[in-house]
């Protein structure tokens, strides 16, 4: 091996080591930003930069004010940043209204400080806000569904970065468990109904599901802590979603939110119950989360918790 080859190999190793030392929270923020940029450049799904500005400003201002009031200091605002982008992408109001972005942003962040058990919030903030909006104003608010299409190049970029970052943040097992559960359950549902299988599986490549599997069900602050129970809870969420879809197929009188976004509704129903049981069993009285590798060990717990988001979506 020549001197040039050795030098190139050392450079590659140095860059790899630097990448491994990057705080995972910045990787998550990068991924949601990538989703936003790709979605806007390719499909113009934002619908107006005033929506993005309003959601981001409201999320970050609410986080700053409530954290200062609750903890005496302004915490890291990365979680608010991720929530603001997720809301901008997912919320689709009628008539170009802006109020759902302001209200949704406030509800998302406020839920972290109000809906708590033993100093831990129970809902993924973005998930809570979107389902709350759909329940309160189903005729005024909808969610992003198929507006991206299933373009191979777009999905390849997002899924490649998403899977790599999920592996780096040590939540890949949750993402893959949900995807596998979704594929199996929806294939069985299609067979039972005598429908083609592929149309029932296609939604997993849509934008809402990409935000859901990379940011919401993997949120470190709202998932249960033991790995074996993480598998169990993710499967239960997928089962609940499948049951909501079956109920919708049968014409049961479900809330519009459950028909419009069964995955979000399933997490909204199952996630906080699982987290509450986890906290109650452990006797945890301080903010708890699934550990993320790479976070500085000396970082104050409050800052570290508020900065992390695994969820449109946080």
Would you name each region that the model predicts?
Residues 72-149:
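Membrane-interface helix-loop-helix junctions at boundaries between adjacent transmembrane segments
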Residues 51-63, 79-88, 100, 104-108, ...:
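Alpha-helical transmembrane segments in multi-pass membrane proteins
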Residues 42, 136-188, 194-195:
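Internal active-site segments that recognize and position negatively charged phosphoryl groups
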Residues 80-93, 127-141, 156-159, 179-190, ...:
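Small-residue-rich segments of transmembrane alpha-helices in multi-pass membrane proteins
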Residues 1-68:
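N-terminal signal-anchor module of multipass membrane proteins
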Residues 43-58, 90-104, 140-156, 197-210:
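Structural signature of hydrophobic alpha-helical transmembrane segments
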Residues 12-14, 60-72, 107-121, 160-170, ...:
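C-terminal ends of transmembrane helices
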Residues 8-31, 185-300, 310, 314:
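C-terminal transmembrane helix-loop-helix hairpin of multi-pass membrane proteins
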